Amino acid sequence: MHALALGSDLPALTPARVLTSWTPNPPLLLTVLVLGALYLGGISALRRRGTSWPRARTWCFVGGGLGSLALVGFSMVAVYADTLFWARALQNLILVMLTPMFLALGAPLSLLRELLSAPARARAAVVLHSRLARALTFPPVVTLVLVIPPLVLYLSPLYEQTLRDQLVSGLAGFCLVLGGFVYYWSRLRVDPVPRPGSYLVTMWITLVEVLVDAILGLTLWLGPVIAAAYYLGMGRHWGPDLRTDQDIGAGILWIGGDIIGLPFLATVIARMTKEDEHRAVEIDAELDAIDAIEAEQLPVTDAAAPRLWWEEHPELAARTRRKN
């Protein structure tokens, strides 16, 4: 394993260095450890109370969420993020789409709710269902929260600042994860949400997000080279040229975003199907209850005695009446 300092004259990226290059990142390491300890500690507290917690959620939060965060913060992606446009594009894509999706699937807010006392839970419910929370989770708002940060990042001088200043880079990454989490939290609805909207709305929002990915990808592909002065000043003599490097990054943001969106769509469809089945069971129970109430309100009458077969025959029935 080779530890490489960010901003140094990096060696050429080879297949071996893809697997062995890494960089220390103490603030991110502390963040990952604290979040992991809080989440796993909460699960342990629930188990001491005799309450179970789904393993799938734990794997999503720790393995998928924190694991992907560590991947883009310590691995080759982080090492070459300030040198190669496509490496930074891959890093930002994971931060805005993959990491927050897995964090939301881990249901951290539900875990926190289970650990709160009854009064604290009631106060949290008031905040959750406040007008401000409902406004912030309105579908068009959360859509903008997801799609605007990448556009601002790449189509403004902010992108070059993230390359030159590690603090700005960290804050930008935090905003990407936060915006993505708000989106996935409100659309997946694994955790309680202020506005329980329809999953069909989520499907339409996803189409908008796909369109924005295409617009950003095409803009980077057909537009001028971003942060050209910075990249030229590095004096890199290996790897793709600046134009090709940016084209690769544009493809990652465009196609990669669509690929990451596939498991999200699969999860939405699965939850929509489960919700429909649950709703069908509720409707059947309500209809059965209504039928039972109506049956109790009907007057009790003696059932008519069944008629003999010859009483149904016109000629035989007439002869029987004459004899009587």
List PLM regions with ranges.
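Alpha-helical membrane segments of multi-pass proteins
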Residues: M1-N324
